[in-house]
From Swiss-Prot:
SUPFAM superfamilies: Cytidine deaminase-like, Methylglyoxal synthase-like. Pathway: Purine metabolism; IMP biosynthesis via de novo pathway; 5-formamido-1-(5-phospho-D-ribosyl)imidazole-4-carboxamide from 5-amino-1-(5-phospho-D-ribosyl)imidazole-4-carboxamide (10-formyl THF route): step 1/1; Purine metabolism; IMP biosynthesis via de novo pathway; IMP from 5-formamido-1-(5-phospho-D-ribosyl)imidazole-4-carboxamide: step 1/1. Pfam families: AICARFT_IMPCHas, MGS. Its EC number is 2.1.2.3, 3.5.4.10. Keywords: Hydrolase, Multifunctional enzyme, Purine biosynthesis, Transferase. The keyword Endoplasmic reticulum does not apply. GO terms for molecular function: IMP cyclohydrolase activity; phosphoribosylaminoimidazolecarboxamide formyltransferase activity. It catalyses: (6R)-10-formyltetrahydrofolate + 5-amino-1-(5-phospho-beta-D-ribosyl)imidazole-4-carboxamide = 5-formamido-1-(5-phospho-D-ribosyl)imidazole-4-carboxamide + (6S)-5,6,7,8-tetrahydrofolate; IMP + H2O = 5-formamido-1-(5-phospho-D-ribosyl)imidazole-4-carboxamide. GO terms for cellular component: cytosol. This is Bifunctional purine biosynthesis protein PurH. NCBIfam families: PRK00881.1, purH.
Length: 515
């Protein structure tokens, strides 16, 4: 009995050669619509789908393969006599191979001019149905959704006249993943259209971007997946211009770096980062000076660190960066001379280019945190804060220089691991206490790091001070201005201590925990 294949693809890459080889192996080919036209034009004889169903395509192609003659031919178990008899009684011929890929829904909704009606029309119905039927019956039917599998299937058919069960099972698994991802994109699109913020089912889909050598530690396996609907301002979309492949820890650090730099749009700014904590932030009227400040903030910790700049890297800045051992540099662009300088004898230095003009769109994405047995979902900590809404709670008002420095410090503290304390002036960080289990410990670490640069410095805390002992430490160090959320039941104790020492203190009313 001649074996039959059903071919209906939107991605026609490789399909002509594949179909010709099938014909050479003695297969009959059923086809539909544009695929049939393409095969016929290439000289590949095909059977029209309506010759199989006895029913014409209708409703602009919405109904053409949803028919018992198709699904019966796919679902009939070859090892069950009653199935074969039912097929015979109803003149259903068996289909042994299905090659289908789906309407380009993803590509359609990514078009800037897409309309709702166009998106709906690109939801495939018949394709997923055929794929599911064939994949369910993979004991007998080979199903192909990816052109990358054409060669394997043809090779096995040529060698043995059929594919192996292991191949059919693997291809079926790929099909179910493909359909699930396709449906997840449709669900994501419609969920966004109706503005559903808390869906009862969360369906998200990601594509494998990079198989990694290992994870956070060598004993951990890891891979990097990219959102199926890409985010332009993201590590997944960054263009790598030089260097080794990014590691698991590199990717997490870069993600933290490009989040931090989003908050410093107004002036040229450089952020140096280690282990997802900023170790130096500098801003100035030009990017070279901003680099100087970021480097001077902590010339020890920057060694082996990540650096992100929010302006084009010029030659002067590149010359200063080149002697420093850095893991990664990220910027919106690089001058030709700067790139030549940075890559000179630095084949391992990872240099990334990222479209900073797409930052705003990245801020609306949800954050996902895996826990054992579940997933936490929250929006990003990107609340718009207006300094005019902040409250000076002490007798002394901040000076103009202090006010500028406090605003700078408040931007920086958002990205320090809690309990987080940062000491800055109006253009660079000076000391940082991160990740301590008590706040006064973070205060002491930040003061120790900044001890030679405390004149005119200010201090920011990511959460309220629970006790006045923190204020006492700050005052003893000579810091004269503090910014914090407030909200402790002992706020008045802290205010009294600040007044006693002549400090100025601002309450923002917004906490910035970062675990």
């Amino acid at each position: 009995m001649t074996k039959r294949a059903l071919i209906s693809v939107s991605d026609k890459s490789g399909i002509i050669d594949f179909a010709k080889e099938l014909k050479n192996l003695g297969w009959d080919i059923i086809s539909t619509g544009g695929t049939k036209v393409a095969l016929d034009n290439a000289g590949v004889e095909t059977i029209a789908i309506d010759d199989v169903t006895g029913f014409p395509e209708m409703m602009d192609g919405r109904v053409k393969t949803l028919h018992p003659n198709i699904h019966g031919g796919l679902l009939a178990r070859r090892d069950v006599d009653s199935h074969l008899q039912a097929a015979k009684d109803n003149n259903i011929e068996l289909i042994d191979l299905v090659v289908v890929n789906l309407y380009p829904f993803k590509e359609t909704i990514l078009r800037p001019d897409v309309t709702y009606d166009l998106a709906v029309e690109n939801i495939d119905i018949g394709g997923p149905s055929m794929l599911r039927s064939a994949a369910k019956n993979h004991a007998s039917v080979t199903v192909v959704v990816d052109p990358a599998d054409y060669a394997t299937v043809l090779g096995e058919l040529a060698d043995a006249g059929q594919t192996t069960f292991e191949t059919r099972q693997r291809l079926a698994a790929k099909v179910f993943r493909h359909i699930a991802a396709y449906d997840a994109l449709i669900a994501e699109y419609f969920t966004a259209q109706v503005g559903e913020a808390k869906p009862e089912k969360l369906t998200i889909t990601y594509d494998l971007k990079q198989a990694m050598r290992y994870g956070e530690n060598p004993q951990q396996d890891a891979d990097f997946y990219q959102k199926a609907l890409p985010t332009d301002y993201s590590i997944a979309s960054a263009k790598q211009l030089n260097g080794k492949e990014l590691s698991f820890n590199n990717i997490r650090d870069v993600d933290a770096a490009i989040r931090i730099i989003r908050d410093f749009k107004d002036r040229p700014t450089v952020v140096a980062l280690k282990h997802m904590n900023p170790c130096g932030i500098g801003q100035a009227d030009d990017i070279e000076t901003a680099w100087d400040y970021a480097y001077e903030a902590d010339p020890v910790s920057i060694f082996g660190g990540i650096v992100v700049l929010n302006r084009e890297v010029d030659a002067a800045t590149a010359k200063k960066m080149h002697p420093i051992f850095l893991e990664i540099i990220i910027a919106p662009s690089y001058s030709e001379e700067a790139l030549a300088i940075l890559t000179n004898k630095k084949k391992n230095l990872r240099i990334l280019e990222l479209p900073f003009d797409a930052q705003a769109a990245s801020e609306v994405e949800a954050e996902y945190t895996g826990v054992v047995g579940g997933l936490l979902v929250q929006n990003q900590d990107v609340v718009a804060e207006n300094p005019s809404d902040w409250q000076v709670v002490t007798d002394r008002q901040p000076t103009e220089q202090e006010a500028t420095a406090l605003e700078f410090a408040w931007k920086a503290i958002k990205y320090v691991k809690s309990n987080g304390i940062i000491i800055t002036n109006d253009h660079m960080t000076l000391g940082l206490g991160a990740g301590q289990t008590n706040r006064v410990g973070s205060v002491k670490i930040a003061i120790e790091q900044a001890k030679d640069h405390l004149d005119g410095a200010v201090l920011a805390s990511d959460a309220f001070f629970p006790f006045a002992d923190n204020i006492e430490e700050v005052a003893a160090a000579g810091v004269k201005a503090i910014i914090q959320p407030g909200g402790s039941v002992r706020d008045q104790d802290s205010i009294d201590a600040a007044n006693k020492h002549g400090l100025t203190m601002i309450f923002t009313g917004v906490r910035h925990f970062r675990h």
